[in-house]
Every structure is written in C-alpha cells, then in structure tokens.
Amino acid sequence: MSVKFMESVGYECDLQTMAMTGTTRHIYFGGKVPMIDVFIDKLDYCHEVNYDGRLELDPWSVSLADILLQKLQIWEINHKDLVDIEYLFTVADFGEDDAKKVNVGYVARRFADDWGFWYTGTTNLDRVKEHVGGVDALNDDQKAKIKQVADEVRARIDQEPKTKKWEKRSKKGAKKIWYNTGFSDW
C-alpha cells in the first residue's frame, strides 16, 4: 500500500510512526475510517507475528490463526484484546489448516519454537479463562465454550514438540525478559 494512494483517498500518514518503523508499519488518519494501521510483512510488538507467505490464505484479511497470534502476543493485554479473543473463540472453527478456521497446528508450531511467545500466549489463554467469568454480556453456555476452546488450544500447544531453541530458552524462564519492550504504539 503506497503513501500516495492513501493520500489520494483522503488519508494523512503519521510521519513519526513512519520514521520509527517505515518499512514495517504505517498509520494513516482521516477519511471515512478515522485511523488505519498498516503492518507490512509482520507485526512486531511483544512478539513477532510474521505474515510472510500467509497473506494469500484469505482474500479479505490475515488468517484467523494470525489474528489469534496478534492478540496472544500482547504481554500487557487489556480488556478489549481479551474480548476480541473471546469473540473469536465463540464464532470461529478450529482445526489443523487455514481453510476458514483457526489453524491451531500453526499456532502450536509457532509457540514450539519461541519460549517467550509460548509463555505470553499460554498466560493469555489463562487470562481469557479468568476474564470471561466477569463478562456479563455472555451467558453461561458461551462462557463455558470459551473456556473449553482455550483449554483445547492449550492442549494442542502443549502437544507440539518443542525445538532445542525453545528448550534452551525455557531454562531461564521468566527471570529474563522474554518479550520485546522496544516497540512503539500510536
């Protein structure tokens, strides 16, 4: 997506963000949608979510597995992001491929190679299970389904064989920072 195109349809590029992340992220303001956040090839916040070879999986969006990874990678996760995960858990199908479902195998393989991402992601699955109990808008069946899906996703993650890199990093645990702290949010 080019800056010229976005400007031609009424958006202004946030130059500060572009100066800091020029090749990976652009933020545009204006137009009918007040803000558009564009990630190029990867999202690199607390943990990297790489879209290389994955943008072709869905004609309208990043894959559902990548959407889940985008949320699970946030160490200081907030209410809105937990609700996004809970919504995904109530409406999406889960399986071992990307055909209109969350590819849990892909998520598990991604976590199996990165202890830090695994730790953040599995911690956030626990946070979802805790958070959903306080969401008054959900009925008991919906809450139970969300908890069940969180448990099933976690079980699949746990089942995936871990790499030597994961095993080596796991020995240090949370005593050493395991997530990126040098990212900038708008």
Model-found features: residue ranges?
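Short amphipathic alpha-helical segments and helix-helix/interface helices
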Residues: 2-3, 154
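Conserved catalytic core of two-metal-ion nucleotidyltransferases
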Residues: 3-46
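The feature captures the alpha-helical scaffold/lid subdomain characteristic of nucleotidyltransferase
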Residues: 34, 43-60, 64-186
